[in-house]
Amino acid sequence: MKRGATKEEIIRITRELIARNGIRAVRVDEIAQTLGISKRTLYEMFTDKNDLVSACLEAMSHQQRERIVACRKRRGGNPLQKVLRLTNEYIDNLYTVDHRFLSDISRKIIFEEHYDEHREFWRRELTDYLETCRQEQLLLPEIDAPAFAEQLMNTILDLRLNGTVREELRLFCRTILRGAGTRKGIELIDRKP
C-alpha cells in the first residue's frame, strides 16, 4: 500500500478516471484501489464522492480558464480567426473527456453549479469575440452575439454527445461562422492565418 497519497494526487487520479469513464461509473473503491490507499483515507480528505468530484471539477475549470487566457493572449489573426481558435479550443476541451462524463455532469443536480459556471465562462468569452466581430462589421448586423454564442455552444455539445468527430465539429463551426459573416468576414475566414 502507498503511504499517504496527497490531496492533489487523489484529485489528479480521480480526474483521469471520471474523464475516461464518466462520473457515475467511477466508484470510491476503484479510486482507493488505483491510489493504493484505503477508502477511510479518502473519506478523511473528502466528505464523500461528490465532494471529491467537486474538487476535480474545480481543478478542471481552473485548467480550462488558463487555456482560454493563453488562447486570448496569442497574437495574430483577425477577429474571426480568433473566434475560430476559441471554438476549436472549446471543441478540444470537450474531447479531453469521455462523452459519458459530459452527460453525467450536465444531468446531475449536485454538479449543476459547476456546469453552469463552466458554460457561462465559455459563453462570455465567445460572446466578447463575436461582439468585436460585429463592431468591425465582420458578422451580419442582425447577429445577436449572446444568442449566437449560446446556440453554437449548445449545438457543439449536442453533436459531441451524439458522437460527432472532432474535425467534423471544427468544420461545422467554420461553416456556421462563414454563413454569419459579411463578405469582408468571409474573406477573412478564408484567409490563411
Where are the predicted features?
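Alpha-helical DNA-contacting segments of helix-turn-helix folds
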Residues: 52-60
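Hydrophobic alpha-helical connector segments
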Residues: 55, 69-96, 149
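Short linear capping/connector segments at secondary-structure termini
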Residues: 102-110, 190-193
